[in-house]
Amino acid sequence: MSEDLDRRHFLARLWTWGLGVMAGAAAWTSWDFLQPVAGQSGGPVATVSPDKIPTDSVLEVPAMRGYLTEIEGATEAIWWKCPHLGCKVPWCETSGQFECPCHGSVYNRKGEYRRGPAPRGMDRFEFTIIDGVVVPDTSKIIRGAPAGTPETINEPPKGPECLDPTAG
């Protein structure tokens, strides 16, 4: 009988030890996952001089992961990340608007919400002009206005959309 008792204690300790190892591994990987990726935290990014920014389209700037445009004399630095699920939102030259390929959200040239499942307009970056160059700070994000907020620019679509508006 004492042999069964020893075996029972051994198995109980083995299970406890095994569960402890699994819990430790889960905690370790979760902690590792929550740490910021080196070099991904954002910061100032030198781009182009203001006279190179289009007034009727957008300029894609991969280094800042976004776009620059000029609207009524004001520069806008727009993050290309969709606020719905984080997809990269490309500019559609034919329609003159941003169109998310993941779920069909559409934004005007200023990144303001037009339609789709996104909860708000596209986020923007704060920026300064240093030595004649636009320098967005990708660590300083300005949250887009909530869906349903009236657009501040009057630019209807120029033509056909790049994505099928009935898809999604």
Residue ranges and their predicted role:
Residues P117-A118:
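Interfacial helix-loop-helix junctions of multi-pass membrane proteins
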Residues E3, H9-S95, F125-G168:
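N-terminal pre-ligand scaffold of iron-sulfur
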Residues K81, K88-E112, G121:
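Membrane-embedded segments
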